[in-house]
């Protein structure tokens, strides 16, 4: 936090004064209105949904929060994620992050932020980055297939997700495991008014190209499909087409093959097309109502996509086979029953497809069994729901939220207070509501609502939703958290909001009225065996794999567990998993029901604060201790801080802890010694201990390094000394041997030479063999002298362009002749350069630069070679009015020329004056005396020019340039070679970078309205000067004809 920036309100509610419900809500409102959406209760983060993107996320903030402790910066979800990650890495303790709140409170976004933070701060490397990318890319896939727009949330999770991210001992991710809970598959066939089906259906229709839609036999119009709510086909702020492409990319990153992606989309399309199967009454001779399919083409297309005969598929939808002993009886279904079978098939296909996708993701991100790993769990599960019509789905969703609230109560409120009591720490009890009685009402194994629902589903006889409700009224009419019409009548209460087919439970979040209609069917979740067997016969590989029970060889008459039992067991496993980890809480709050930014509804927030138990949590944290740990692990971690306990301590663990803390300057109020644990009141004290430990570790590391280096140097010295003595002895002996050998060889050699010399001296006068060598040397020297004198007389002129050179008279002098020619030419060039003025040097450099840029590329370049670069073509030096265009720019004007600017809208040209200085490009109307456009050379990203005889060029500006808000500029100049050459040199001098000069007939320019493709073509040859004709070809193309 910047030093001069004060906090808005109270950042940690533990410090709130006075502490009551009203001040708590006002503090949250004050922070929310100032866009401070995060608030602490100790190490619990309260997150308010801002319903807008705030500039408080990204790499910059991640880097900031990873370098500071929890309370040193503003409250943020990154701070909690950092604490959880560091605890997992440093303390070797598995973590879980529990994200709770109502639907629409921002839980899904919070889980994404946690995962993105962990992915950013953990290790690097090719394999690690691949794992991180797969974990992150699982989110868009699961959101597409498991999220939908509801009345209260445009991106509501309609399933529960718990992800275990697994790390190695260094804190680098190895992979993960995703567990999903109770997909709301009834949404596949029916949605409430104002809601949508799952996102993937709309994304597929909006984002698939025409070829893919044709292959899937789909139409782009959502109103065509019976399973899609045509009234709400689009959601504000959500681009279904781009999201579809993102889902395809994410599936590829995770590891889905192209074939698997295609099969997933085919099965998704099948679900859509099943909703368009029209069923009609058919006449039978026996008078029994029957049904048939009136759209033969539609069922035939579905059969082709499944790889089934359409007749067989129709039979499975319109009839049912009943097995009685060894006999099979086929009964026809009426239209209502057939529609139920069709919808059940669609729901089961989609639900099993979703489970298959989760399983497939887990196969890609799973970790090998042999690796030791640490685990961080992230729970993103549907929020508490209170709708106008609450059914079985809302019942199990709210049951799950009750269990999560129970976890929070037991681990933060109840467990903490009981721990103080066990440890003998003085404590003032804080009252709170324990929702265990509600959980027991729902999940009791024998007398719970779920148990009664299963019993009703399994018992013989006539079973209906009303008999189930009657059983509940019989058992729970006197329960304090259960209400129904029967219990109200018995107590002479009159409530018109309570229907005859409804019951009400007083949840921790408020009272919810449930309509029992459909409870029995949804709990049974039955799919006729004929449909399973028919799907197993399908030739579509993915569809067939979704229905293994359809295999006649593996058919089982055992009744599958009910949906309620499956969900109850899954929640029990989840609770066991959460209890085994250290919890970190994010409590999400929805500020208003209209999803509007900046709007704070105090009553709504107060209700959520009450059932989340925020006030009780503050009181417990305020009266308690922020950190506690057993004496033994605490001593193991911090014993190095005291000389009494380091390096060895053989006494009692508690006594050792007292020695450690006694050696530090800590207040006695900050510490409390329990029976088995040490309690520390303030997080700042814990941070102080960690800082002292870090400094002590540095000291110990230095000490270890010092001792090791000393030992290594002593050992090395001893080895070197021993080796040196041995080497010296061998070396001296060998040196003497070699010295004696050399002396002896030298003596013998000298004797031989002396004898030879004496012999040659005595007998030289008798031999003439030396005369030939003397004559040869004389002749060769004479030829060389003649060659050099002749070359001196016939030297060519000192003109640089004169490349003549006399030939060598003999072949033996060819190499020397070539080298002399090279040296003479270099000498001529140096003489020529020494005679040039600075202006002539600059002119030649410009010509050289033009040659490098345009020679062999631009057709008009040869004509520009003999013409000197003038620079001023408008008489700038003699015109004070034009000189004012230069403004305060210092230095000379490199180019002053009249150019034509091409209009972005219609391609017409208009005259402009262009000035090029050492720092800017200035454009103005020829009739005005003030600069209209001033572009810094650092904003010029490049230029594009054609290879023809024209003078058209595009001035490309960097995207971050603020000089021209309308984008790039198209200009026409009669001196394009000179202008671009000098601009290239000016950019190089001003920015130390080379300007990109592209010579091409096709290039793209960026205008405010978007990119425009410019194409330059050669028209029929015209007389006189070259003419350019610019024409717009639609909104995204322009054609320039050179005549």
Curated annotation (Swiss-Prot):
The keyword Phosphoprotein applies. Residues 858-1042 form the TH1 domain. Pfam families: IQ (PF00612), Myosin_head (PF00063), Myosin_TH1 (PF06017). CDD domains: MYSc_Myo1. Residues 8-694 form the Myosin motor domain. Gene3D superfamilies: 1.10.10.820, 1.20.5.190, 1.20.58.530, 6.20.240.20, Kinesin motor domain, Myosin VI head, motor domain, U50 subdomain. Residues 571-593 are annotated as: Actin-binding. GO terms for molecular function: actin filament binding; ATP binding; calmodulin binding; cytoskeletal motor activity. Keywords: Actin-binding, ATP-binding, Calmodulin-binding, Motor protein, Myosin, Nucleotide-binding, Phosphoprotein, Repeat. Phosphorylated by ALPK1. GO terms for cellular component: apical plasma membrane; basal plasma membrane; basolateral plasma membrane; brush border; cortical actin cytoskeleton; cytoplasm; filamentous actin; lateral plasma membrane. Residues 697-719, 720-742, 743-772 form the IQ domain. Disulfide bonds: none annotated. One of its GO terms (biological process) is sensory perception of sound. ATP binds at residues 101-108. Involved in directing the movement of organelles along actin filaments. PANTHER family: MYOSIN, UNCONVENTIONAL MYOSIN-IA. Belongs to the TRAFAC class myosin-kinesin ATPase superfamily. Myosin family. This is Unconventional myosin-Ia. It comes from Mus musculus. The lineage of its organism: Eukaryota, Metazoa, Chordata, Craniata, Vertebrata.
């Amino acid at each position: 936090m910047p030093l001069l920036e004060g906090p808005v309100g109270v950042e940690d509610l533990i410090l709130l004064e006075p502490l009551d419900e009203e001040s708590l809500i006002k503090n949250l409102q004050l922070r929310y209105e100032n866009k401070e959406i995060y608030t602490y209760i100790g190490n619990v983060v309260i997150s308010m949904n801002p319903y807008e993107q705030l500039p408080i996320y990204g790499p910059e903030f991640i880097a900031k929060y990873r370098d500071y402790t929890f309370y040193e910066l503003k409250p943020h979800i990154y701070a909690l994620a950092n604490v959880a990650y560091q605890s997992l890495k440093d303390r070797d303790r598995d973590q879980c992050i529990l994200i709770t709140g109502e639907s629409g409170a921002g839980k899904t976004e919070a889980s994404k932020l946690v995962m993105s933070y962990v992915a950013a701060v953990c290790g690097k490397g090719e394999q690690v980055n691949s794992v991180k990318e797969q974990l992150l890319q699982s989110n868009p896939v699961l959101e597409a297939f498991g999220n939908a727009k509801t009345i209260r949330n445009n991106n509501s999770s309609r399933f529960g997700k718990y992800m275990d991210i697994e790390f190695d001992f260094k804190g680098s991710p190895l992979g993960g495991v995703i567990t999903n809970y109770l997909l709301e598959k009834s949404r596949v066939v029916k949605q409430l008014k104002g809601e949508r089906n799952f996102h993937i259906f709309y994304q597929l229709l909006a984002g698939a190209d025409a070829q893919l839609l044709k292959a899937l036999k789909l139409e782009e119009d959502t109103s065509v499909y019976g399973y899609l709510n045509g009234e709400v086909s689009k959601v504000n702020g959500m681009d279904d087409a781009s999201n579809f492409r993102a889902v395809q990319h994410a599936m590829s990153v995770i590891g889905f093959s192209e074939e698997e992606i295609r099969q997933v989309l085919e099965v998704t399309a099948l679900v859509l097309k099943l909703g368009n199967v029209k069923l009609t009454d058919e006449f039978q001779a026996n008078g029994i109502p029957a049904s048939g399919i009136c759209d033969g083409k539609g069922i035939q297309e579905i059969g082709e996509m499944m790889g089934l005969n359409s007749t067989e598929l129709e039979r499975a939808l319109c009839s049912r086979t009943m097995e009685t002993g060894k006999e099979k009886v086929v009964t026809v279904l009426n239209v209502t029953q057939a529609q139920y079978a069709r919808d059940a098939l669609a729901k089961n296909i989609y639900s099993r497809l979703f489970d298959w996708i989760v399983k497939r993701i887990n196969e890609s991100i799973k970790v090998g069994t042999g690796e030791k790993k640490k685990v961080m769990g992230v729970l993103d599960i549907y929020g508490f729901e209170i709708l106008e019509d609450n059914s079985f789905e809302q019942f199990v969703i709210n049951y799950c939220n009750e269990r999560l609230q129970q976890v929070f109560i037991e681990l933060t409120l109840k467990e903490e207070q009981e721990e103080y009591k066990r440890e003998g720490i003085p404590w003032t009890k804080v009252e709170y509501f324990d929702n265990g009685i509600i959980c027991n009402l729902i999940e009791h194994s024998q007398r719970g609502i779920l148990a009664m629902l299963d019993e009703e589903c399994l018992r013989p006889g006539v079973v209906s939703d009303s008999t189930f409700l009657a059983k509940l009224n019989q058992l729970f009419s006197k329960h304090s958290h259960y209400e129904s019409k029967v219990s109200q009548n018995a107590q002479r209460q009159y409530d018109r909001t309570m229907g005859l087919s409804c019951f009400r439970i007083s949840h921790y979040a408020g009272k919810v009225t449930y309509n029992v209609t459909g409870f029995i069917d949804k709990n049974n979740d039955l799919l006729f065996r004929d449909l399973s067997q028919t799907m197993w016969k399908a030739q579509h590989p993915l569809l067939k794999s979704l229905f293994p029970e359809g295999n006649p060889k593996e058919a089982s008459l055992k009744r599958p567990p009910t949906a309620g039992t499956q969900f109850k067991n899954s929640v029990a496993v989840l609770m066991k998993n959460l209890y085994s980890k250290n919890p970190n809480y994010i409590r999400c709050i929805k500020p208003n029901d209209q999803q509007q930014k900046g709007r704070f509804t105090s009553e709504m927030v107060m209700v959520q604060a009450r059932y989340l138990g925020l006030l009780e949590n503050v009181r417990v944290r305020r009266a308690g201790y922020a950190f506690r740990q057993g004496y033994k692990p605490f001593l193991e971690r911090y014993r190095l801080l005291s000389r009494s306990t380091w390096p060895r301590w053989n006494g009692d663990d508690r006594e050792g802890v007292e020695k450690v803390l006694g050696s530090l300057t800590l207040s006695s109020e900050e510490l409390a010694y329990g029976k088995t644990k040490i309690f520390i009141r303030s997080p700042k004290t814990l941070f102080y201990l960690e800082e002292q430990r870090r400094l002590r570790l540095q000291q110990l590391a230095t000490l270890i390094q010092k001792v090791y280096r000393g030992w290594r140097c002593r050992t090395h010295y001893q080895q070197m000394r021993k080796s040196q003595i041995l080497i010296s002895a061998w070396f001296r002996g060998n040196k003497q041997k070699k010295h004696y050998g050399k002396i002896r060889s030298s003596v013998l050699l000298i004797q031989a030479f002396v004898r030879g010399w004496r012999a040659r001296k005595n007998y030289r006068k008798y031999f003439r063999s030396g005369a030939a060598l003397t004559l040869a040397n004389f002749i060769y020297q004479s030829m060389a002298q003649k060659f050099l004198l002749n070359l001196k007389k016939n030297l060519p002129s000192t003109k640089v362009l004169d490349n003549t050179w006399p030939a060598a008279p003999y072949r033996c002098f060819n190499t020397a002749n070539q080298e002399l020619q090279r040296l003479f030419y270099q000498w001529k060039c140096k003489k020529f350069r020494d005679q040039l003025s600075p202006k002539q040097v600059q002119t030649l450099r410009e010509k050289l630069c033009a040659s490098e840029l345009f020679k062999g590329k631009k057709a008009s370049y040869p004509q520009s070679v003999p013409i000197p670069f003038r620079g001023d073509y408008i008489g700038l030096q003699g015109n004070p009015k034009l000189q004012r265009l230069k403004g305060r720019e210092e230095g000379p004007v490199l180019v002053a020329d009249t150019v034509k600017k091409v209009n972005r809208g219609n391609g017409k040209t208009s005259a402009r004056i262009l000035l090029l200085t050492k720092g800017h490009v200035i454009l103005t109307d020829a009739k005005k005396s003030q600069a209209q456009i001033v572009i810094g050379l650092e904003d010029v990203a490049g230029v594009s020019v054609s290879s023809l005889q024209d003078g058209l060029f595009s001035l490309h500006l960097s995207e971050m340039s603020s000089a021209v808000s309308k984008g790039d500029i198209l200009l026409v100049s009669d001196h394009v070679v000179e202008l671009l050459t000098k601009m290239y040199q000016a950019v190089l001098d001003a920015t130390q970078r080379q300007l990109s000069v592209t010579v091409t007939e096709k290039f793209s320019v960026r205008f405010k309205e978007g990119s425009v493709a410019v194409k330059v073509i050669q028209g029929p040859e015209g007389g006189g000067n070259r003419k350019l004709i610019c024409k717009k070809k639609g909104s995204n193309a322009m054609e320039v004809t050179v005549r």
